[in-house]
Amino acid sequence: MAKGKFERTKPHVNVGTIGHVDHGKTTLTAAITTILSKKFGGEAKAYDQIDAAPEEKARGITINTAHVEYETATRHYAHVDCPGHADYVKNMITGAAQMDGAILVCSAADGPMPQTREHILLARQVGVPYIIVFLNKCDMVDDEELLELVEMEVRELLSKYDFPGDDIPIVKGSALKALEGDQSDIGEPAIFRLADALDSYIPTPERAIDKPFLLPIEDVFSISGRGTVVTGRVERGIVKVGEEIEIVGIKPTVKTTCTGVEMFRKLLDQGQAGDNVGVLLRGTKREDVERGQVLCKPGSITPHTHFTGEIYVLSKEEGGRHTPFFNNYRPQFYFRTTDVTGSISLPEGTEMVMPGDNVSITVKLIAPIAMEEGLRFAIREGGRTVGAGVVAKIIE
């Protein structure tokens, strides 16, 4: 049977479930696909189909992730759910599944637990912009006051990590009851309330093509009589012939003009997000540009050396280090297309970092990189990946 054609008529939004183990993330995911597919079409997925999440690799790290999709009246959602806590940590840090918003699942019977807290912190660190709460297992709590107490706790926890705890939509329900077709307030109607909250609270993400132009430079050539050409894949935005652009990173920032865009040996008047192009630069010498720099819209991104980040350190089984590392560890940081050496400072009270851990760190690079919060990187030793990370805050 052929899969239904993917209709691009509705805007596309990426979401995922986060929260403590056994609070009902996978059951909720199954309930959403089951109930929304009845009303808007799409494919219902059973719990065990989602729970048997396939392995995938992101930046050399193996992650188990289940991908489902569903529709609401106004949108198409791609939704990720992970079976284990470690998978969430890896997923969020590597950005394997970028989330425009997250659904925090919290059991009303248990209240916030350690991983509830950790996932909120991770969401903050890796730049998940919006969180919606599904207060699950409400059928197990008879006391209305207890429900209110748990809701208050969750709101306080969100505020503590700089999310707008007072304004975040909290939907009360029971994913299991909804899956069973229960029509009471906490059954199927709760899933529709959640869908409405997703539609109204998470803004439609800006498309890559509408963002300011950025192209990570992969190669540089000199073409006699024409000048210098840099090649790479346009990450976002559009570059038009005749536009002023900047070369940022590694060396001092310089301005130049795009005098030509080439794709598959054909001349174009512009290159856009997703295109693999060659960009001809006016008056730029071959030796003034190198792999690891970026071409960008002037002023849209700046070079930095000093930042805080959240990293996941590969375990020995994943091909990572066999031993811990300590303060002032100096690996290479692989940003976009190149390695830059940097030193790591660990948080106070953290003596060392073991393979398989995740930790907040401060990094000082020996050369500046075009950087913004949310940028992903790999940590490498002699060309082999030993960790993955994301820029949380730029210091300078």
From Swiss-Prot:
Stretches for region G4: 136-139
Limits of the tr-type G domain: 10-206
Keyword flag Transcription: no
Region (G1): 19-26
Binding sites annotated in the UniProt record for Mg(2+): 26
Reaction(s) the record says it catalyses: GTP + H2O = GDP + phosphate + H(+)
Region (G2): 60-64
Amino acids binding GTP: 19-26, 81-85, 136-139
NCBIfam families membership: EF-Tu (TIGR00485), PRK00049.1 (NF000766), PRK12735.1 (NF009372), PRK12736.1 (NF009373), small_GTP (TIGR00231)
Annotated protein name in UniProt: Elongation factor Tu
Encoding gene per record: tuf1
